[in-house]
Every structure is written in structure tokens, then in C-alpha cells.
């Protein structure tokens, strides 16, 4: 018989072995939590992977996978699914999960274009409490919530984000910082107040001052940038210059000693081609001077209706107006200037150069490919044209090495180092209108357009620019012929300030509670259009005859106290406004090129005389004059961000693709007179 003491000792010795076996057996059935690496950003996957992991997990691990799936869905543009999954999150979350939930809520708000809602949520987050990868997302959300509007808060967010980024993202951050700085006016920059310890921000603001002082002198700009880099060697922008300033340092002026002018001289568009040629040659022979952009002109007397040339949709005419039957038949009178507030101008001129060799090529007589080959053989240093959109498309396909100032732009802009695009089109004017209306603080615009391809193009251009500026839905309403409008007036129907969305959005949200965020879908389009007079701006694209019916019809249906400001394109302004028309248009704002707004009276008189007082052709004449200025400053427009010419067709600047943006003059009918819009 074995002694009992021996049995007890043997059992005691076996116990640790048994316990260890049990422990290891338990570990063998437990799967490690893999969600941590994904939460911290050291590993990434798509939403399908996260959703699968979520279904196979439980408790905190399941919540982590759910949060990751929401983040991925937002990134993939699947906002509706993200909202649905977000609303399924449990109430009980740990601190880390709560912070992630709030950050996700802000990111969803941004995806739904609810920028105010996103800003409210971001204000509840303390960046120092976040993980490093969350901090980068937080600052990006702050940047996105600013909608690109330059401000001190946007600059601070960009500066805070920069150290958290990789090399590629750093360049994007630095470019965005410079974009914010260079988008400010000098007046905005002068109002900025910073703290004494914000050394990086101070450096950026000093670079901004260098740019303000020298942006129209590339040589001075180069020297200023080099000096700034020496004074601020530790600034991120000094170590990695903004791309636009790298281009400045590489600046080389283009030659205009031998110019090829490509225009249609036969067929339907010939009238425009020959008018542009007239303006270009006049500027070449007598030079150009900066134009006062904010001077209005009011007709001194009734002005006769002038026949307007009818053109194909592809022609770059800004105001293809039909004949109005509501204007007088007296001889045309010259506009009289009206005083206006002085504004700072970019003092850039293009001197006369009569000796420069200019050769005209008719794009209506032979294929563009043959013309371009001939231009190269002739040794042209710069090409101005072509004018028609289909010819510009052909130009891009040719991959010509020549510097080209195209007088139109294709449907899809291509960034070519040797091409700039200068268009006088209704779409270009609509984009300026979107910027002007947005600057006036309007939130809910309606576009009133003719039922035509022209109307569709204008509506799309306006909506695209509006949303690029951070705006939401744009509504459109179409009208028919003048006879249909007349019938509407006679029938007393009026025009309601409602419409259909130009670019409907599947989901935007209406609100979120503070303690338990819940994301909801957007109000319907009917709710948007009928929600207590939400429309606060109406942009009208109409001829003088059409707008003479449209404005009274809006008042007839909505009353004079509708709260919506009315705006119109230059299509409604053809130099035909008599005193009755001006009184009827009371309060209406409309856009016009500075030359015809009284900013350059000598040239206006010269242009109107050359085109028999046809305002549409006068605009094309001004385009020819500005084309000379742009050709003489081609390299500056192409390479120097912020370079500006106060031209006859607008204040001219170039975007990164070298599309020439035109800031137009805006005028207003007031007590029978035309004055600068306030």
C-alpha cells in the first residue's frame, strides 16, 4: 500500500502541470483582437473586410470593426450605408470608441456637405486626446469644413496637420496652405491677428506679403522668395516650396515677336472671328492700359434695338441675344459714366508692338492639323486661337509644342504646360455669377434659363461652380419663347421661385443630437423648394425682351417682398434699355464686361463704332484686345499664381490649369439709373 503522504505529494506536484495545460488549452481557443492595428492606422482594408470581421466578432471587438467599417464606407463614398451602420452603434462605448464615433460623425457630415454640422461636432473634440492618426483626420476635417474659404482658422489647421503627414501629403498640405494665403485679398490679410508664439504662421504671412508686393514682377518675386527662404529656414514652406512658387522661380518670358492668329474668317462664325481680329490688331498697334473694373455706365437716353447675330452653340459668344420687341427705335446713344468706389488694380499693361509679325490663319478653310503644321514651319513663337470649341479639341489632340492661348475651352480641361484657355462664353459668365452671388452671402439659388442647349450648359456651369465654392443644391426652372412668357403675363400665372435640382444629392442630413449623434437623410427636393421661401437668389439668363416679362412675372407670383435678389447675365444688357425698362428692372443686378460698364470709355466708343453699336460684337472686340494683353503676359499667366490683368472683358487671373477666370463688373438698376451693385 502506498503511503498517503506520498499520494498527496504526487498530487501536489501534478497540479501545476494540469493548471498549465488548462491555461494553454484556453489560450488555444482565443483569437487575438486584430482590430487594434486597424484602429491605429498601421493596417488598412476595405469596408467588405471590416463588415465580415464585424459579423464574426462580439463585444468591444465587434464595435471596433463596426467603427472601421463606417470609416471605410465614408472613404469609399458609400455615405448611405455609413449612416445606416452609424445609427446601429450601441449606446455603451469606451472613451476611445466615443472619440472615434464623434470624429466619424463629423466626417459623415462633411460627406453630406453639412459643413456647419461638421464644425459643431469638431468643436467638441480635443485634438490632444486623439491618437496620432486620428489627429491627422481631425485636422483634415477642419480643413474640409472650411470649404476652402481662406481664414486664420484654416491656416492654423493646415499648419497643425503638416507634421503628421508623409512626404507626398506634405507637399499637398503646403500647396493648400499657399492656396489659402494667395486666395486672400490684401484687405483680408491685413485684418489677421496672430499670437506671439505662432512662428510658422508668421513666416507664412511674411511670404504672403512678398507675394502681394511682387506678384506682377516675376524677377522681384524670385528675389523675394529666395530672401524669405533665408529668413525662415525652418518653415515647412521654405524646405518644400509651394508648387506655384517653384514655377515662379523657373519663370521665363514668352516671345510675341511672331504671332499666329487662328480664327474662322468664313461661315457662320466669321463675324466673331473678324471682330476679334480687329480688336487684337488695334491693341497690337496702340497698346493697352489697365481698366477700371468698378465703374458703371448708364444710358443717357433710349437706345435703339440692334440686330444680334445668330450663332451656333459652339461659338464663344457671351450674349447671343435675340431681338426684343419691347425697346425703342431711336438712334443709339453713348453711355455716360457714373461715379463708383475706387478699387485697387493690377497695374499691368501690354505695350504696342506694331513691328511684331502677325499672320492670320483661317480655321474655316482647312483642317486645323494642316494649319498647325504651317504655323510651325512659319516659325511662330505663340498661337492665339482657335475660337471654336471643336477646333480647341483638335488642338489638344495634336500635342503641339507651341505656346497657345486658345480662345475657347474644351468640355474636359487638360492641363498642358504650353496652353492657356480664354473664353467669352455664357458658361464662363455663369461661373462668375456663382462667385458673385456666393460672395453676397446667398445660400439657395434658383437658375432661370431658356429651354435650350444653351440653358442646360449655363445651368450646369453655375451649379458646378456653386458646389466648388461649398454651396449645396442649385435649382433650375426653364422658360419658353417670348410669346409663351407674354401669355403667362396675360394669364396672370407668374413665375414661382421653385425648380428641380440640377445635381440632386442622394443623402444630406438634417441634424444630430449632442449626446447621441444620429445621422438622418436629407429633406426631399419638394421640402427644399417649398420650405418657407428658401430660394434667396435668382440668376436669370434671358434677352432684354424675355427679362421684360420674367421680372414682372416673378413679382406677380411672389410679391415684392419675396426676399430673393434677382441677378441677370449680360445677355439681358444689349445697350437697348430705355427709361421705362430701367424702372421696370428696379433692383436687378446684372454682369457686364468692364469696358461696357464704363471702365474704358475711349475703347468702348472705338469698339461700338467698329461694330455698329452691336453690344455682342463689342464684347468680342474687347476679347481681341485682351487676347493681345494675355499673349504678352503668357508666361506670367501660366507660371505665376495670382498674376492679374485688369482687362476689358474682366479682371483676368488663371487657375492651375491656366483657364483664364474673368471677374466681371456687376451693375444694378436703381431709380431708373444704372449704378455699381453694392
Swiss-Prot record:
InterPro entries: LpoA, Lytic_TGlycosylase_superhlx_U, Peripla_BP_I, TPR-like_helical_dom_sf. A lipid is attached at residue 27 (N-palmitoyl cysteine). It comes from the Bacteria. Residues 1-26 form the signal peptide. The keyword Membrane applies. Residues 300-310, 330-340, 513-528 have a biased composition (Low complexity). CDD domains: PBP1_YraM_LppC_lipoprotein-like. The keyword Membrane applies. One of its GO terms (cellular component) is periplasmic space. A lipid is attached at residue 27 (S-diacylglycerol cysteine). Keywords: Cell outer membrane, Cell shape, Lipoprotein, Membrane, Palmitate, Peptidoglycan synthesis, Signal. Transmembrane segments: none annotated. This is Penicillin-binding protein activator LpoA. The lineage of its organism: Bacteria, Pseudomonadati, Pseudomonadota, Gammaproteobacteria, Enterobacterales. The gene is lpoA.
Amino acid at each position: 500500500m502506498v503511503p498517503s503522504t506520498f499520494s498527496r505529494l504526487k498530487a501536489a506536484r501534478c497540479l501545476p502541470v494540469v493548471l498549465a495545460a488548462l491555461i494553454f488549452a484556453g489560450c488555444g481557443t482565443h483569437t487575438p483582437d486584430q482590430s487594434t492595428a486597424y484602429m491605429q492606422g498601421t493596417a488598412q482594408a476595405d469596408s467588405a473586410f471590416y463588415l465580415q470581421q464585424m459579423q464574426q466578432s462580439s463585444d468591444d471587438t465587434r464595435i471596433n470593426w463596426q467603427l472601421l467599417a463606417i470609416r471605410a464606407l465614408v472613404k469609399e463614398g458609400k455615405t448611405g450605408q455609413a449612416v445606416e451602420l452609424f445609427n446601429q452603434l450601441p449606446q455603451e462605448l469606451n472613451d476611445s470608441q466615443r472619440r472615434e464615433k464623434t470624429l466619424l460623425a463629423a466626417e459623415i457630415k462633411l460627406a453630406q456637405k453639412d459643413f456647419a454640422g461638421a464644425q459643431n461636432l469638431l468643436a467638441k473634440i480635443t485634438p490632444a486626446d486623439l491618437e496620432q492618426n486620428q489627429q491627422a483626420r481631425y485636422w483634415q476635417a477642419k480643413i474640409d469644413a472650411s470649404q476652402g474659404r481662406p481664414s486664420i482658422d484654416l491656416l492654423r489647421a493646415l499648419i497643425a496637420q503638416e507634421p503628421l503627414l508623409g512626404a507626398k501629403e506634405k507637399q499637398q498640405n503646403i500647396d493648400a496652405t499657399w492656396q489659402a494665403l494667395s486666395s486672400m485679398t490684401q484687405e483680408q490679410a491685413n485684418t489677421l491677428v496672430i499670437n506671439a508664439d505662432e512662428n510658422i504662421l508668421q513666416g507664412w504671412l511674411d511670404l504672403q506679403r512678398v507675394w502681394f508686393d511682387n506678384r506682377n514682377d516675376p524677377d522681384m518675386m524670385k528675389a523675394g522668395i529666395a530672401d524669405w527662404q533665408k529668413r525662415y529656414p525652418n518653415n515647412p514652406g521654405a524646405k518644400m516650396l509651394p508648387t506655384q512658387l517653384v514655377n515662379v522661380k523657373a519663370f521665363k518670358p514668352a516671345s510675341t515677336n511672331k504671332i499666329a492668329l487662328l480664327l474662322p474668317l468664313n461661315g457662320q462664325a466669321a463675324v466673331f472671328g473678324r471682330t476679334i481680329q480687329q480688336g487684337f490688331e488695334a491693341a497690337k498697334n496702340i497698346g493697352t492700359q489697365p481698366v477700371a473694373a468698378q465703374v458703371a455706365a448708364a444710358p443717357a437716353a433710349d437706345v435703339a434695338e440692334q440686330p444680334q447675330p445668330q450663332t451656333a452653340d459652339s461659338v464663344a459668344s457671351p450674349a447671343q441675344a435675340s431681338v426684343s420687341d419691347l425697346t425703342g427705335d431711336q438712334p443709339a446713344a453713348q453711355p455716360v459714366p457714373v461715379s463708383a468706389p475706387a478699387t485697387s488694380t493690377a497695374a499691368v499693361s501690354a505695350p504696342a508692338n506694331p513691328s511684331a509679325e502677325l499672320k492670320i490663319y483661317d480655321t474655316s478653310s482647312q483642317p486645323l492639323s494642316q494649319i498647325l503644321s504651317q504655323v510651325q514651319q512659319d516659325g511662330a513663337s505663340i498661337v492665339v486661337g482657335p475660337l471654336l470649341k471643336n477646333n480647341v479639341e483638335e488642338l489638344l489632340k495634336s500635342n503641339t509644342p507651341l505656346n497657345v492661348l486658345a480662345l475657347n475651352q474644351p468640355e474636359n480641361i487638360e492641363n498642358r504646360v504650353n496652353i492657356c484657355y480664354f473664353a467669352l462664353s455664357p458658361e464662363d459668365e455663369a461661373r462668375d455669377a456663382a462667385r458673385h452671388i456666393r460672395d453676397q452671402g446667398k445660400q439657395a439659388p434658383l437658375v432661370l434659363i431658356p429651354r435650350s442647349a444653351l440653358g442646360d450648359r449655363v445651368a450646369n456651369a453655375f451649379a458646378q461652380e456653386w458646389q466648388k465654392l461649398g454651396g449645396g443644391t442649385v435649382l433650375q426652372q426653364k422658360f419658353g419663347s417670348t410669346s409663351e412668357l407674354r401669355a403667362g403675363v396675360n394669364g396672370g400665372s407668374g413665375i414661382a421661385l421653385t425648380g428641380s435640382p440640377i445635381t440632386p444629392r442622394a443623402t444630406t442630413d438634417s441634424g444630430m443630437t449632442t449626446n447621441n449623434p444620429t445621422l438622418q437623410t436629407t429633406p426631399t427636393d419638394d421640402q427644399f423648394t417649398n420650405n418657407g421661401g428658401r430660394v434667396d437668389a435668382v440668376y436669370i439668363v434671358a434677352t432684354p425682351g424675355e427679362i421684360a416679362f420674367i421680372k414682372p412675372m416673378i413679382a406677380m407670383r411672389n410679391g415684392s417682398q419675396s426676399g430673393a435678389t434677382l441677378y441677370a447675365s449680360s445677355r439681358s444688357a444689349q445697350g437697348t434699355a430705355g427709361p421705362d425698362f430701367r424702372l421696370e428692372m428696379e433692383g436687378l443686378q446684372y454682369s457686364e464686361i468692364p469696358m461696357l460698364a464704363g471702365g474704358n470709355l475711349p475703347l468702348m466708343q472705338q469698339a461700338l463704332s467698329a461694330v455698329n453699336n452691336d453690344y455682342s460684337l463689342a464684347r468680342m472686340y474687347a476679347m481681341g484686345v485682351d487676347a493681345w494683353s494675355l499673349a504678352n503676359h503668357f508666361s506670367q499667366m501660366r507660371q505665376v499664381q495670382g498674376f492679374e490683368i485688369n482687362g476689358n472683358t474682366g479682371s483676368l487671373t488663371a487657375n492651375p490649369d491656366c483657364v483664364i477666370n474673368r471677374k466681371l463688373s456687376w451693375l444694378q438698376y436703381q431709380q431708373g439709373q444704372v449704378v455699381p451693385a453694392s
